[in-house]
Amino acid sequence: MNASSSSHSSNSSHSLHQTFSRDAIANSLTGKSVVTLDDISTAQIRMLLDKARYIDSHRKEVAHTCDGRVLATLFYEPSTRTRLSFETAMLRLGGKVIGFAGAQLSSASKGETVNDTLKVVSNYVDVVAMRHPKEGAAFVATQAVSTPIINAGDGGHMHPTQTLADLATILARFGRLNNLTVGLCGDLTYGRTVHSLIETLCRFGNVHFVLISPDELKTPQYVIDRINDTPSCTYEETRDLMEVIGGLDVLYMTRVQEERFTDREQYLRLRDTYILTEGKLQKAKSHMPVLHPLPRINEIAVDVDDDPRAAYFEQVKNGMLMRMALESSVLGDELCGYEPTDFVNVPEDELQAVDAHGISLADPRVHTTDENAPENLSCPNPRCITNSELTLKRKFYKAESDRHEYRCMYCDEEARA
């Protein structure tokens, strides 16, 4: 359940895909921002997966797809893989890249707002990839300009392009994205990759999530609500990885993120809670891939790297390919020689799947600001951008859960009066 959608409209319970032709789906991402994968349909996700496979085997053919295009990478916090992946993706498509790596290298160090930065940069470029430490920053960017914005990670909130890499890796290993038991281990509170992956897998349905974390780093309620709202998905929570590892089809490890902690002693106490070794993998299924968004610290021992189940470096390659697919798609630039294959043949149960409130899981899932929300509402999340850029208008949506609570449009946290 995600409010940070760049496309605002009412929710629809019918499936759009039944009326889409292949060409319509292939062109339907043109000009679109992607703050969360909830912004796009499952058919569009399948299209991106299909395009990435084509790109991988047709590097020369796609090398001029984005000739004349310019990508801005606005990275307000450190990144190696994601920034280089976005930049390499555009370069391999024939485009160019400008940007900065670190807020200290931009006018943000002088106090410039995200809104103003985007209004300036959008005059120079065709598409923007933005990473920011504040949750909801990418949503702010989409409200400021019409240039397509791709969220490269907003605080501990969402990371949609990492999820695309994760989906590609899981699909390559299993040939499907459902009927799986998926373990997610480590920092589930601030792990934006975990939040994005759970929310997206829920849309494909029939997934059992095993949430493995210390009590201090449990999954946020808005993500749990999403699982609860999906009739075909279930979850369990545990502190003990070894107790459940034998039943997992996929294990997604995460690092405990020092940069998200305000209490260093708590970080030091929690950082080594889970360390996956080759010995521990002996209890796992022989086909269970180990995923990790990287960077790792010591939560996966180096001796695991040579195990055929280690899939985290595959994710890196898949991330670049998926970003190539996404960048070209939002720009409306056709891949030379590409013809859609079977991505439109979405399984009927996926087309018909609805959540507990009758909302289609296949269609984009968007929320609108509730103009009748109480005026005294505020977002209690200290990591939300509305609590640092105080000129931003507070916006809230009414959650679909039976509790009828309001949530922040920027970060999805439950609002407080």
Question: Model-predicted segments: where are they?
Answer:
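Rossmann-like adenosine-cofactor binding region
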Residues: 227-304, 309
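Positively charged, low-complexity intrinsically disordered leader regions
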Residues: 2-4, 13-84, 88
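Adenosine-phosphate binding glycine-rich loop
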Residues: 287-288, 293-345
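Cys/His-clustered metal-coordination modules, chiefly Zn-binding fingers
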Residues: 366-417
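A short helix->loop->beta-strand "cap" motif at the edges of active sites that frequently abuts
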Residues: 147, 205-207, 283-289
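Glycine-rich phosphate/diphosphate-binding loop of Rossmann-like nucleotide-binding domains
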Residues: 76-89, 171-253, 402-414
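Phosphate/diphosphate ligand-binding glycine-rich loop within oxidoreductases
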Residues: 64-171, 298-301
